[in-house]
Regions:
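Short, charged, low-complexity loops and linkers
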Residues: 15-30, 59
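Short, contiguous alpha-helical
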Residues: 2-11, 29, 33-43, 50-90, ...
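A generic structural signal for well-ordered alpha-helical segments enriched in polar/charged residues
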Residues: 37, 41-45, 106-113, 117, ...
Length: 183
């Protein structure tokens, strides 16, 4: 007897994938909320008047680094809501650090709303995304979300160094910092 694979939306395999997608959506939403709370603490630890600090002439300013968080979350919301464009149309960097923080809050809310309203099956759909230097491929939405969150974590670490270099107090991130001991 020949074995066939069903691609019907009522097949057990499809139902299992849909259940897994729902679990992935919840896991991502939980981690996203925790990481964004921490990122906002790092952003607001930058001392007043230091948004144009850059540690090296080839480095971005603190304002430019902090604006990367909103760009990534804009991509997350677009991927979730089927508004993905490649190449992306990035908005200009906000003119003030207060505007950067406001954009961070707005894009956090947009992603949280998209996570709450997007069918979990969307996570398994693909969109074009870079996979290496001058390399593109179709990448699952869930993988884009994790990539962008990890990119945000990377830039949060970068910004925490700027906070330290400008005399700010670095908040605890995954454990105590020199400025926020736990004991």
């Amino acid at each position: 007897m020949e074995q066939t694979t069903s691609t019907s939306t009522t097949s057990p395999a499809f139902a299992a994938a849909r259940t897994q997608s729902a679990a992935n959506m919840k896991q991502f939403a939980d981690v996203f909320k925790k990481e964004n709370s921490c990122t906002r603490r790092v952003m607001t630890a930058l001392p007043e008047g230091q948004s144009e600090f850059r540690p090296h002439p080839s480095s971005k300013t603190a304002r430019e680094v902090a604006s990367i968080f909103s760009l990534g979350k804009g991509g997350m919301a677009a991927a979730l809501t089927n508004n993905w464009q490649w190449p992306p149309q990035f908005p200009p960097t906000p003119a003030t650090y207060a505007d950067v923080v406001a954009a961070f809050d707005a894009t956090t809310q947009a992603v949280e709303q998209a996570l709450a309203n997007t069918p979990s099956a969307r996570l398994l759909e693909t969109v074009p995304f870079f996979t290496g230097p001058k390399q593109m491929a179709d990448v699952r939405v869930i993988d884009i979300l994790w990539f962008m969150l990890h990119d945000s974590i990377h830039h949060r670490g970068q910004l925490s160094v700027y906070v330290r270099m400008t005399g700010g107090k670095v908040p605890s991130i995954y454990g105590p910092s020199g400025d926020e001991p736990w004991v």
